Amino acid sequence: MNRSVVLILLLNIIVSVVIVLSSHSWFSVCDGLELNTLSVLPILCGQFSPRGVESTIKYFLVQAFSAAMILNVALVQLWLCSSWSVSCPLNSFSSIVLTLALCLKLGLFPCHFWFPDVLQGLSFLQGLLLSTWQKVAPFIILVSVCNIISINVLTTLGCLSVLVGGWGGLNQSQVRKIMAFSSISHLGWICSVLSYSIYVGCIMFVVYIVLSSTVFLINNEGNLYNLSSLARLVYCNNVMGNVLVLVILSLGGLPPLTGFLNKFIALECLLSNNLLVPCAILIVGSLLSLFFYLRISFNSVLCLFPQHSMMLFSWRNVSGYYGNTSFYTVLLSILSSMSILGLLLVPALWSYH
């Protein structure tokens, strides 16, 4: 695809999120969501591979159905309240429909089935876009309506998403599917906390974007599509292999890495509201997720299978790694540093709480 076309589409995606962020009416929110969906579709199927086109069609159908649900909620509110305002109180039916629509857009339980299959059919850069930036607009809507929808329903769906994300990733050998279930689990943590503290939920969402972006970029750099291919990264680039292990452990929430911040502030927020049962469920789901994170780390560093010496040079030629400094390298270095050492920023972040 032409670079100028890609830049225009990316600009439209950014503008659509800004429209959703600045909207106070359901009409503008629906416009922003539709612009966001229609702009990302050509990027997802830009390679015109059969699997990529299939994933794009699945993504389009899911997003169209969820947008129709949100539009129906807006029309019901217009009929009941004679207003397009997002802050207008919702009745019980509209609250449940809107919650399910946002779960469908974010890939949360019980509407998570489409996300792993769609992500498996895309490249790592397309999966990065789908797992991070495409979640921003639905997350903004969820933040806007979290005070007018059922807190118990949102917390329950978040806890179940953590369990489903941890359980679903146990028997996976494809890195993209593992990242899909990891996304489901992390967004479950965020939704469980969002009703009690929007500030904590936003911090967790930013940390999730940084960690996921780092993992996707490293895997894209090394063409690491399954667990068996992870071992070659250490042979070809020892520094990047060790960074991948640390970022994966950070994604699992092990201290003293950045990912531990999400677990700590989430549990602190829930315990301050005397929610012991959700905390226990989240911890169990986090342990399930930690198992396949450790599998990735084990295959990346400890399982060093015998390799031919010429494989080192062929791998470097394919990946384009020659040690030169580029924007991609600088971006990956910054994200890796934030993913590993970001816990040092906790005092500065908590001072504004």
Swiss-Prot record:
| Tagged with keyword Acetylation | no
Name the EC number(s): 7.1.1.2
Report which superkingdom the organism of origin falls in: Eukaryota
**Keywords assigned by UniProt?**
Electron transport, Membrane, Mitochondrion, Mitochondrion inner membrane, NAD, Respiratory chain, Translocase, Transmembrane, Transmembrane helix, Transport, Ubiquinone
Name a single GO cellular component: mitochondrial inner membrane
Q: Which InterPro entries match?
A: Complex_I_Subunit_2 (IPR050175), NADH_DH_su2_C (IPR010933), NADH_UbQ_OxRdtase_chain2 (IPR003917), ND/Mrp_TM (IPR001750)
Membrane-spanning ranges: 4-24, 60-80, 96-116, 139-159, 198-218, 241-261, 274-294, 330-350
Per its UniProt entry, what is the enzyme's top EC class, as one word?
translocase
Where does the protein end up?
A: Mitochondrion inner membrane
From the UniProt annotation, give the residues forming the signal peptide: none
* Predominant cellular place of this UniProt entry's protein: mitochondrion
Reaction(s) catalysed by this chain, per the record, are:
a ubiquinone + NADH + 5 H(+)(in) = a ubiquinol + NAD(+) + 4 H(+)(out)
Could you state one GO biological process linked to this protein?
mitochondrial electron transport, NADH to ubiquinone
Q: Which GO terms describe its molecular function?
A: NADH dehydrogenase (ubiquinone) activity
Q: What is the protein's membrane topology class?
A: Multi-pass membrane protein
The record, for Pfam families, names:
NADH_dehy_S2_C (PF06444), Proton_antipo_M (PF00361)
Record's function text: Core subunit of the mitochondrial membrane respiratory chain NADH dehydrogenase (Complex I) that is believed to belong to the minimal assembly required for catalysis. Complex I functions in the transfer of electrons from NADH to the respiratory chain. The immediate electron acceptor for the enzyme is believed to be ubiquinone.
Q: Which family does it belong to?
A: Belongs to the complex I subunit 2 family.
PANTHER family reported in the protein's UniProt record: NADH-UBIQUINONE OXIDOREDUCTASE CHAIN 2
Identify this protein by name.
NADH-ubiquinone oxidoreductase chain 2
